[in-house]
A protein has these predicted regions:
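Residue-level signature of outer-membrane beta-barrel architecture
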Residues: 29-31, 66-70, 104-107, 116, ...
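Repeated loop/turn-to-beta-strand initiation elements of outer-membrane beta-barrel proteins
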Residues: 31, 72-78, 109-112, 162-165, ...
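Membrane-embedded beta-strand positions of outer-membrane beta-barrel proteins
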Residues: 35-37, 78-82, 114, 156, ...
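Transmembrane beta-strand segments that form the barrel wall of outer-membrane beta-barrel proteins
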Residues: 37-47, 77-88, 99, 270-279, ...
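Residues that define the transmembrane beta-barrel architecture of outer-membrane proteins
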Residues: 54-62, 94-99, 108, 148-152, ...
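Outer membrane beta-barrel
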Residues: 73-185, 218, 383
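Outer-membrane beta-barrel "beta-signal"
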Residues: 156, 292, 393-407
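Detector for outer-membrane/organellar transmembrane beta-barrel domains
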Residues: 268-352
Length: 407
C-alpha cells in the first residue's frame, strides 16, 4: 500500500490550488460520477519458478471517477479518479493509486491542468516506445505495460491554427511497481523497490520537463516531443537485500529524449510509426517501431470488420535487458463485430528475429448488458533462449479473466 509516496507538502499545494476555485455549492447537473468493481482471476498453466508462487490468483479492483464542472460555461473542472486492488497472494499488488486528481481551466485557446493526470503518446499496437510521461503500473499490466500511474504535473496546452503545443512540468517522480516474491508474472530474481537508487541527487524530487507539438495534415497525424528528466524504465542491477538474498535493485538514470509518432490513413490502410533518440549515461541510441494495418470491412456480408496488423521494432543497442523489442516482428488479426455489445477480438504473435523467441497474445471483450463488461486475455511464450531479455518471465504464461460491473 506504499506506492503513492508523494510528499504531503506537494499534495497540500495541489489541493489548495484546487480548493481556491471550488464554489460553495454544486448543482447536480455539474457533477458526474462513474465507477467499476472488477473481480479478476489469473491462471498460470506452468509450474512456478519461485517456491512461494502458485498457479492461480484472485483479486478485485475498484475505480471511481468524479468530474465536477463549474465556472463560466463550465470552463473549470475538478477530476478525481482513485484506484485500488485487493490481491489474494501478492501484497505488492494490493495497492491503491490516484490515477487523476486535477484542476482544469480553459481560457480561449489555452488550457491548464494542475494535479495528478494521465497522458498517452503513441500510435502502434505492439509496443508504445514514446509514451514517457506516466510511469508504468507493472503489477496491473505486466506484458503490454499500458496501465499507468497518475503523474503529478502542471500542464499547459494551447491550440493554434498551425498545431497544438503541450508543456509539462513534472515535480515528482513515480517509481515503477513490481510484484512481490509471491506474485506472477515476475522475474526469476525478485525486484527490491526499496533499494532503488537515482542518478540525480534529488532522487524522486527531481523536476522533469517535457513539451510536445501535434497537428493533423490532411490524412496524416504527427506528434513531435521532447522529454528531459528521470527515465521511467529503470536499469535493474544485482544487489543484496537486508537478509543477504540476491535481488534486483532499480536504478533510475537521467535522460534526454526526442521522439516522434506519425499515423496516416489512406482508405482501408493505416500506416503508423513511432520512435525516439535518447541520451542516457553518456550513451546515445535510437529505437523505433512501425507498420501497417489493413481493414476488410463487412466480412462475409456481416457487419464485422477484420484488420490485419503487421509491425516491426528495432533498437540500436541490440539485445539488452531493457529492450525486449530490439529486432522483433509483430503480426495480428483484429476483429470488431460492430454490434451493440462492442465485441472485439485480437490475436497476435511477436517473433524475435535475433533469438527465434515467440510471444503470443490474445484479447477478447464485450459488454454483457448495460452494466457488465467481460474481458479475456492470454499471454504465452515459446522457444525463448536464456540470452533473450524475456527469458526470466517465459515460464509465466497466463490466462486472465475480468468481469467489470459499472455503476
Amino acid at each position: 500500500m506504499a506506492f503513492l509516496r508523494v510528499p504531503l507538502k506537494r499534495l497540500a499545494v495541489l489541493a489548495a490550488l484546487s480548493g481556491l476555485v471550488l464554489p460553495g455549492t454544486a448543482r447536480a447537473d455539474e457533477l458526474g460520477l462513474r465507477g467499476t468493481i472488477t473481480p479478476e482471476i489469473r491462471v498460470f498453466p506452468q509450474d512456478p519458478s519461485g517456491a512461494k508462487q502458485t498457479n492461480s490468483d484472485l483479486s478485485v479492483s475498484a475505480e471511481v471517477t468524479a468530474k465536477y464542472f463549474f465556472g463560466a460555461g463550465g470552463n473549470q473542472s475538478i477530476v478525481v479518479t482513485p484506484f485500488g486492488r485487493l490481491d489474494q497472494r501478492d501484497h505488492n499488488r494490493t495497492h491503491w493509486d490516484l490515477r487523476e486528481a486535477r484542476y482544469g481551466l480553459v481560457a480561449g485557446a489555452w488550457e491548464m491542468r494542475i494535479g495528478f493526470d494521465k497522458v498517452f503518446w503513441g500510435v502502434t499496437e505492439a509496443v508504445h516506445l514514446v509514451d514517457v510521461i506516466n510511469q508504468a503500473d507493472l503489477i496491473e499490466d505486466p506484458i503490454k505495460q499500458e496501465v499507468r500511474l497518475g503523474q503529478p504535473m502542471v500542464r499547459l496546452r494551447t491550440t493554434q491554427s498551425f498545431g497544438t503545443f503541450d508543456f509539462f512540468l513534472l515535480p515528482y517522480f513515480r517509481e515503477r511497481t513490481y510484484p512481490s516474491i509471491n506474485g506472477r508474472p515476475a522475474t526469476d530474481i525478485p525486484v527490491a523497490s526499496d533499494l532503488a537508487t537515482y542518478e540525480s541527487s534529488r532522487k524522486a524530487r527531481h523536476v522533469d520537463a517535457a513539451m510536445r507539438y501535434s497537428n493533423a495534415f490532411g490524412d496524416i497525424d504527427l506528434g513531435l516531443s521532447y522529454f528531459q528528466g528521470t527515465g521511467r524504465d529503470p536499469i535493474l542491477q544485482p544487489a543484496l537485500d537486508a537478509s543477504g538474498s540476491l535481488v534486483l535493485a532499480p536504478f533510475y538514470a537521467q535522460i534526454k529524449q526526442g521522439s516522434f509518432d506519425v499515423q496516416a490513413t489512406k482508405g482501408a490502410w493505416l500506416f503508423k510509426a513511432e520512435g525516439y533518440w535518447r541520451d542516457e549515461l553518456n550513451q546515445q541510441y535510437e529505437t523505433a517501431t512501425g507498420g501497417i494495418e489493413y481493414t476488410f470491412y463487412g466480412i462475409a456480408g456481416n457487419e464485422g470488420d477484420l484488420g490485419v496488423v503487421a509491425e516491426y521494432a528495432l533498437d540500436s543497442r541490440g539485445m539488452v535487458a531493457r529492450a525486449p523489442y530490439q529486432n522483433d516482428g509483430f503480426l495480428a488479426l483484429r476483429w470488431t463485430a460492430n454490434d451493440a455489445a462492442s465485441t472485439s477480438l485480437l490475436a497476435g504473435i511477436v517473433v524475435d528475429a535475433s533469438t527465434g523467441a515467440r510471444g503470443f497474445r490474445f484479447k477478447g471483450e464485450r459488454r454483457l448488458d448495460e452494466d457488465y463488461h467481460l474481458s479475456v486475455e492470454a499471454y504465452a511464450f515459446g522457444d525463448v533462449p536464456k540470452s533473450d531479455p524475456v527469458y526470466s518471465v517465459a515460464d509465466d504464461d497466463y490466462l486472465q479473466i475480468r468481469l467489470a460491473r459499472y455503476f
